[in-house]
Structures are given as structure tokens and as C-alpha cells.
Amino acid sequence: MRGGSYPYHFIFIVFIKGFIMEEILSALVGAVNQVLWDYLLIYALIGIGLFFTLYLGAPQLTKLGTGFKSVFGGLFSKKDKDHEGKSLSQFQALAVAISAQIGTGNVAGVATAITAGGPGAIFWMWLSAILGMSTIFAEAVLAQKYRVVSHGKYIGGPAFYITHGLTPKIGRGAARFLSGFFSIALIIALGFIGNATQSNSIASAINLAFDIPPMAVGIALAVFAGLIIIGGINRIAGIAQFVVPFMAVIYILCAVIILFKFSDHIIPMFHNIFVAAFNPEAVLGGAAGIGMREAVRFGVARGLFSNEAGMGSTPHAHATANVKHPVQQGMAAFIGIFIDTLMVCTATALIILLTDANLSGETGAAVTQLAFNKAFPGFGSQLLAVCLTFFAFTTIIGWYYFG
């Protein structure tokens, strides 16, 4: 009897130890996350963005029009299509970058920023995006400058410009170590953790809206993603250049419709955003427990999760572009943040704040879903599920290439 109970005792002990280890790991990750976002990353991201803005002469402001003209002006011209087989057109490279940038962060991330940081978080999201445009400009220029040809294709990114750009400054060994550390971190963050988050969001949204089992959604995702990924960067770019404009236009159109439906809320909404950016208590009341610190933290954090400025992911796409000068692709890169954060993320914020969905007590994507249901009764959940599926799926294939 005593010997027969041993396996059950063993299983129980393993379960308890596993539970304790999970609790310890969760607490450790939470503590590290708090230190990073409270004391380091916010200041680093804003500081670096401010530095590049001043040092480079605010290219995101002075060259914004030129950037749009460069990317979209020759979109249908023969010149844009006659790029070498080893590279992508400027628009294709931007489409791949945006396909990765526009994901669940544009839907659930913005909702989290508003519920955890108040309406004022949107102001700080805008500010971090504007400053981040200069950071991503620098990333794309460096990716172009230090790219190499491998198997007949241009490849590049932080691993390359860290190795080749920093070797004269810090030595080859130190540069290779930093390059390797970055590469491993990126593979883990995008290839494993990030894509798991995106696919889980798709499965949950589809299950909730159409009652399709998550397992079936997961299998379908794996099949479709595999068919695209197996074709390499050219097939990924070919899909992205058509899907990205379509999904962005549809989503922004939804926001425009909601603007008209709730037009009487527009002025109070913007008033709340700007007042709550510096004094959240004036809008939410002291009982909400949200101060300026939370507004800044969640606004900047959600902005980064969405536009990836300074993250080192999108330069992999920008390195492949066929342009005459690296600065051209730098301008294309900050156009990506303009579209991702200042247009698509702002669309989500407007949808949530105009419908007062942020006051419901819900969190994450459920807030955005409630907003869509209020704005489009009867099919709001289904509409959002389709949009979220496009957003997250293109992020999966984009992140696979980056990782």
C-alpha cells in the first residue's frame, strides 16, 4: 500500500514544485519588467528618439512629405518594378515592415494603454511615435549601409551593423558578442514568444466571433503561414504589398464611420486625452489610481510594442530595399510608424474613447471588441475578428522573416 502510493506522492510533489517554480518565475519576470519600464526603457526610448531628432535635424518632420512621395509617388511606375532580383522595391520592403508592425498591439495593446494609463496614454503614445520615427530612420539607414549579399539576396539588420559598424570602435570580439546576443534575443522574442502571442490572439478572436475551435484555427494558420514562408522574402513581400494596404484602409474606414456616428463626443474626447496626459486625476478621479507615471509608462510601452522603433526588427526588411541612397529607405521606415501608430493605433483609440468602452471594466482586446459591438451592433465582434486576423497573421509571417 505504502509502495503503491509512491507514484502519486511523487506526482503531487512535482506538481507543487512546478507550481511554485511558475510562481517564482512569474514574480521574477514581473519584477524585471517593472524595473525596465519604470527606470530604464521609457527614458532610453524617449531619450534616444530625442537625440536622433535633434542630431539629424528632425527628418520625421522636415522630410515627411518627401518620404510619402518617395514611397508612393512611383508605386505604379516601371522604375519601381524594375528592381534587381536580389532586392525588393522600396514599397515592398515597407509593406513587409508594416506587416510586422501592425498586429495585436494595434488592437489589444492600445486598449491596455487606455485602461491602465487612462486616455492620456494616447498622447504619450503619439509623442513616443514621433520621436521613434527618427530612431527607426537611423535603424533603416544603417541596415542599408551595412547590408550584404547572401545567396543572391540582400540581407541586413542590427546583427550586421553591430558587427561591421562597431568593430572599429570596440573591437571584433565585443562586436560579435553583442551581435550574437541581439540575434538570440530577437529569435526568442519574435520567433517563439511573439508569434505565439499573435496566433493565440487570432484563435481566441475567431473562436469568440465564429465559434471555430482554436485547434482548427491553429492548424489553418500553420498551413497558410507555411505556404507563404516557404516562398521566402519575395513571396512574403508579394503578399504584404496587397494585404497591408487593404487591412489598414478597412480598419481606418471603420474608425471614420464611428467618428461620424459619435461626432458629438469628439471634442470632449480630445480634451480628455490632452488633460489626462499630465493630470489623469482631473479626468478619471483619484479613485482610479492612475497618475501621470502610468499614462507615460503605458503610452510609451504600447507604442513600442506596436511600431517597434528601436527594437531592431524592421531593419531586416528595410535592408532588402532597392534604393539609390540609404536615406530614401530611412524615410520609408518612418512612414511605417506614421501609418502604424499615428493612423491605425489612433483609429483604435478613437473607437474605444468615442464609445466609452474604456469605462466598461473590461481589459485588453475585450475593450476594443465592446467598442466595435457598440458601433456596429450585430456584427461588431465578427468585423473585429477579421481585422485582428489580418493584423496578427501578417505579423506572424513578418516576424518569421525577421527572426
Give, region by region, the residue ranges found by the protein language model:
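Membrane-embedded translocation segments of transport machinery
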Residues: 241, 247-314, 319, 370
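N-terminal alpha-helical transmembrane segments of multi-pass membrane transport
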Residues: 9-104, 114-120, 132
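Flexible loop linkers connecting adjacent transmembrane helices
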Residues: 59-88, 112-121, 134-173, 358-375, ...
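Membrane-interface loop-to-helix entry segments
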Residues: 44-48, 55-68, 178, 182, ...
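Selective recognition of specific alpha-helical transmembrane segments in multi-pass small-molecule
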Residues: 131-139, 219-233, 244-264, 297, ...
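Extracellular/periplasmic helix-exit of transmembrane alpha-helices
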Residues: 137-151, 254-272, 280-287, 320-323, ...
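Helix-loop-helix module between adjacent transmembrane segments
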Residues: 52-53, 128-154, 163-228, 387-396
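Alpha-helical membrane segments and immediately flanking helix-loop junctions
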Residues: 79-115, 142-145, 151-165, 181-187, ...
